Amino acid sequence: MDSLWRETVKLPRFEPLEGDFTTDVLVIGGGLAGLLCADQLTRAGVDCALVEAERLCGGATQNTTAKITVQHGLIYDKLIREFGADKARLYLEANQRALDQYRKLCQGLDCDLEEKDAFVYSRTSRKKIDRELAALERLGAGAEFADNLPLPFQVAGAVKFGRQAQFHPLKFAAAIAGRLNI
């Protein structure tokens, strides 16, 4: 299956590296993680270069769901049970900071950033949803129950997080790449 994102944007192409060069930091890999690392280093004034063997965002990034959210599956109940509420809260807070940082990074970029609600559902177990919602309430997260989703099948319930986001990851990557030494 072809990437929806790759079909709707043309990423910049770069000539193969010829000869030696000097840099303080070399970032290897031109996926979203590599681009963001190189961007943050460059913004901090670090002499940085990024190298990619194939093409920018040719791996996982081109097939992403493109959602930017603090909810990645039914994870918080499990985190509390396995690691405790303090560590689960740290995970939640780190994801919230990442969401906020993406919003800042997207300002002024043509990347189709939209505020969206995020849902994680269970087709069969309302109990799983209730446990997740109880865990999120314990952590102070603003999630709520939903069961009327625009899906072609019934669900037992869903965790709904408001004010999450979605964007065009390759438009974002192209904008970031344009200001880097690649």
Predicted features, each with a name:
Residues Q71-D147:
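Dinucleotide-binding Rossmann-like beta1-alpha1 core, especially the glycine-rich loop
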Residues A66-V70, G162:
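Short, hinge-like loop/turn segments at secondary-structure boundaries
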Residues A60-Q62:
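Conserved catalytic-core motifs of eukaryotic protein kinase domains, centered on the activation segment
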Residues L133-E137, A158-I182:
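Helical element adjacent to the flavin cofactor pocket in flavoenzyme catalytic cores
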Residues F21-L50:
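N-terminal Rossmann-like FAD-binding beta1-loop-alpha1 element of flavoenzymes
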Residues M1-V25, R43:
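Extreme N-terminal leader/targeting segments of oxidoreductases
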